[in-house]
Regions:
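Glycosyltransferase catalytic domains, chiefly GT-A lineage
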Residues: 1-285
Length: 285
């Protein structure tokens, strides 16, 4: 039975993000086979060959817009869903464990998202001032917007209105800066989630030395297991394999630049030699 009070939403602008979203949904359906999924996208594709996409339940919201406008939709999520309880997952996530308890959190809180365990140092995020220029993002505890549980209400509508306004006002490509200010100025009851709810894997995760999280957020850590799954989906949906491979390589280059050539070499070795182990851990075997 479809639960009409709950929904899960993704925003996939660009072909790579569409296949990432569909891979995330593949892992989701091993945990939750019933909750309705919305996919907001600017790619006109046919999911007919995706066996875990239920056309009678799930819904694609197609907007022929530029890919760089994706955050305009993210900061206005509440406009696209009627369900009472909602979770937004970034496309580059894998759902590895049950998350049912989070729905009940929304009986007591208006919004739940991960509190970042370290300072935000990234240029364009951490060095931006908020709250009447009183604080820099790097000087204040902050949240990550990759996984957001929220409950529909007038308060949440006001929060999204603020978030969208701050995003436009800041005129930067990151939505996280506006997220901070809108959260702090809102009257929402905010539940900070722990790291397992939105986990960024390091080399120890791929070595199998880290407990499996609830939600894995791999960003540019696109292993060979993940890459092969993405390419399978690209073939099923008849999307542009060349473009998707190029985008994957670009993201990997970003990871290599961040961690250095030696650590990148180690990571690739682990991806190669622990391929089957990783498949099992990611529920993709």
């Amino acid at each position: 039975m479809i639960n009409k009070r709950k929904a899960i939403i993704y925003i996939g602008f660009g072909e790579l993000y569409v296949v990432m979203a569909l891979l995330s949904i593949k892992t989701l359906r091993k945990i939750d086979k019933e909750t309705k999924v919305y996919l907001i996208t600017n790619i006109n594709f046919d999911p007919i060959n995706i066996e875990y996409w239920n056309k009678d339940r799930d819904k694609i919201l197609y907007f022929p817009d530029e890919s760089n406008n994706n955050r305009e939709y993210k900061t206005s999520l509440n406009k696209y869903i009627d369900e009472e309880k909602v979770v937004f997952f970034d496309c580059d996530t894998l759902i590895l464990s049950k998350f049912d308890i989070a729905w009940s959190y929304l009986d007591y809180f208006d919004i739940a998202l991960k509190m970042n365990p370290v300072k935000q140092k990234k240029i364009g995020k951490g060095d931006v001032s908020i709250l009447n220029n009183k604080y820099l993002i790097r000087d204040i505890p902050h949240f990550n917007s990759g996984v957001i549980f929220f409950k529909k209400s007038d308060l949440i509508d006001e929060f999204f209105k603020l978030w969208n306004q701050f995003y436009k006002k800041n005129n930067i490509k990151y939505d996280q800066v506006g997220l901070m200010e809108s959260l702090f100025l809102s009257k929402l009851r905010i539940l900070p989630l722990t790291e397992e709810w939105n986990f960024f894997p390091d080399i120890n995760f791929f070595k199998g030395k880290v407990k499996k999280p609830i939600i894995l957020h791999y960003t540019n850590r696109i292993s060979y297991v993940i890459e092969n799954e993405l390419l399978k989906i690209a073939r099923l949906t008849k999307l542009d394999l060349c473009e998707i491979k190029n985008k994957i390589n670009k993201k990997r280059s970003e990871r290599k630049l961040k961690i250095g050539r030696l650590e990148w070499f180690k990571l690739r070795l682990i991806w190669k030699f622990l391929y089957k182990t990783e498949q099992k851990r990611l529920n993709l075997s």
